[in-house]
Each structure stands twice: as structure tokens, then as C-alpha cells.
A protein has these predicted regions:
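Conserved acetyl-CoA-binding loop-helix of GNAT-fold acetyltransferases
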Residues: 95-98, 104-121, 139-144
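Mobile, glycine-rich extracellular loop/lid and propeptide segments
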Residues: 77, 103, 132
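Conserved catalytic-core motifs of GNAT/GCN5-like acyltransferases
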Residues: 130, 143-164
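Conserved beta-strand-loop-alpha-helix junction that forms the acyl-donor binding cleft
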Residues: 129-139
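GNAT-family acyltransferases
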Residues: 1-93, 100, 118, 156-180
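Conserved GNAT acetyl-CoA-binding A-motif
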Residues: 119-130
Length: 180
């Protein structure tokens, strides 16, 4: 298993990943902002531009990463490089989704830890991660990765839980970050 950036070789794997989510009624995919009408090449190009600091107007630079095992995508994460007022209120720095058939196997913490490492390398001191209040599995993932509960906030789509991960405290004294 490895965490990679989307490439042209992942076209069939991405289609399969999205189909499994859709079959489970999941169309609002946290961590994935591709457009249905885009070709795979357009999706790859957009993710590359966004990670290099060239997002669409009104968006922030972000890095979308995929956890893959062989030719199969297991999960996706999106790390927003900074927060707008909207992201501070309800979106956070990181969104992630694991395909339904792979949930409960430790993939979500791996994606969140990778995003935390990226954030630390960019000089961030804290990482805001939110989840729907009813999503107890995601809340456990965030807490497992060092998230400290801040508050529960109402939104148009229901209440969310807000957590902060202190990236300064999360680093091991040896400089290792693989424990995150």
C-alpha cells in the first residue's frame, strides 16, 4: 500500500472507486473534488494545478492524495493548504473518504496522518479536521490521530464536530512522524 497523487494510470481504479461509493449512495465524497463531466486527464491536470497553488477562483490550494493497493484505490484525502472563513467554520483542512468495502481497516488514519505530515512540512502548527456529528467512526479516527475536540457547530446540512490536531505536539522527539 502506498499514498500517491492521481496519475493517468489510475483511470480504471478511480472509476471503480467512485462506482463503489455511488452504489452505496455516497455521492458527496469528502476529499474528492473532481467534476463528473471531466475526463480522467482533466481531473489529473486539475489536481496537479491545485496542489501547485493554482486552484479555481474562490478555492484554496490543496493536495489530493490516494491510498492505493496495487491497482486498487482504497481511499482519498484532500489537504487544504490554508483556511478561508468558510473552511474555518465548516470544512477544515482535511477531508477523506475510504471505499465502503475497505472501512474499518486503518486506512482513514493513514490518510489523515499523511495529510498531517504534509501540513507540518508546509509549516502549519495546527490542523482543523471536522466530521458530521453522527459519524462516530470519523470522530474516532480524528481522535486517534491526536485531534482535540473543540466544539460542535450547526450547519445547513446538520451539526459537525470540530477537532484541532496540534502538529507541534504530534511530532516525536526524534523527529519521526510515522506515529501520527
Amino acid at each position: 500500500m502506498r499514498i500517491v497523487q492521481l496519475d493517468l494510470e489510475h483511470e480504471a481504479a478511480l472509476r471503480d472507486f467512485l462506482a463503489e461509493l455511488a452504489a452505496h449512495g455516497e455521492t458527496d465524497i469528502h476529499g474528492f473534488f473532481g467534476e463528473p463531466e471531466w475526463t480522467h486527464a482533466e481531473t489529473v491536470a486539475a489536481f496537479t494545478r491545485w496542489s501547485c497553488g493554482d486552484p479555481p477562483p474562490g478555492w484554496v490550494p490543496s493536495t489530493t492524495s490516494f491510498l492505493v493497493d496495487g491497482a486498487r484505490i482504497l481511499g482519498v484525502s484532500n489537504f487544504r493548504h490554508w483556511l478561508t472563513p468558510h473552511l474555518l467554520e465548516r470544512g477544515g483542512h482535511v477531508g477523506y473518504t475510504v471505499r465502503p468495502s475497505e472501512r474499518g481497516r486503518g486506512h482513514a488514519p493513514r490518510l489523515l496522518r499523511d495529510a498531517a505530515r504534509r501540513a507540518r512540512r508546509m509549516g502549519l502548527r495546527q490542523l482543523l479536521v471536522v466530521c458530521d456529528s453522527g459519524n462516530l467512526a470519523s470522530a474516532r479516527v480524528i481522535e486517534k490521530c491526536g485531534g482535540a475536540f473543540e466544539s460542535e457547530s450547526p450547519t445547513d446540512s446538520g451539526p459537525i464536530r470540530r477537532y484541532w490536531i496540534d502538529l507541534r505536539r504530534a511530532a516525536a522527539p526524534t523527529g519521526r512522524t510515522d506515529h501520527l
